[in-house]
């Protein structure tokens, strides 16, 4: 089931502030993950960032965990860690000219989303229980 959701963001740049309009469309589905997750905590987000006349589109999967002891948590964190290593390597190689940091508050969870924008668009998600 698809539903539109509009959330309040704290959008900041590490170097300077950049005004942006961010729209989130949440999709409650298990179709985009290989892991078993209860449908109420499996969410896919589609982010569109419009800033200075340019629009960037980012799709990523977000899992909110109600029980940190669940076995799939370790595996998903491992995958996220592998992805983050690739992001850091490419950033250190100078392939990114922008580094945006975005914080979202959802219930008792804090999600840190680092969005790297250049010729390619990547997103690294690190979710931790507040």
Swiss-Prot record:
The chain crosses the membrane at residues 15-31. Its main location: membrane. Keywords: Membrane, Transmembrane, Transmembrane helix. It is found in: Membrane. It is a single-pass membrane protein. GO terms for cellular component: membrane. This is Uncharacterized protein YHL005C. It comes from Saccharomyces cerevisiae (strain ATCC 204508 / S288c).
């Amino acid at each position: 089931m698809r539903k539109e959701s509009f959330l309040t963001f704290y959008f900041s740049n590490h170097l300077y502030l950049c005004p942006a309009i961010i729209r989130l469309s949440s999709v409650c589905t298990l179709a985009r993950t290989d892991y078993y997750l209860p449908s109420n905590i499996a969410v896919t987000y589609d982010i569109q960032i419009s800033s200075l006349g340019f629009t960037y589109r980012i799709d990523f999967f977000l899992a909110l965990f109600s029980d940190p002891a669940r076995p799939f948590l370790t595996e998903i964190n491992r995958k996220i860690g592998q992805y983050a290593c690739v992001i850091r390597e490419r950033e250190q190689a100078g392939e990114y000219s922008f580094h945006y940091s975005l914080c979202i508050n959802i219930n008792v969870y804090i999600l840190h989303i680092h969005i790297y924008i250049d010729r390619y668009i990547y997103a690294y998600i690190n979710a931790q229980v507040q």
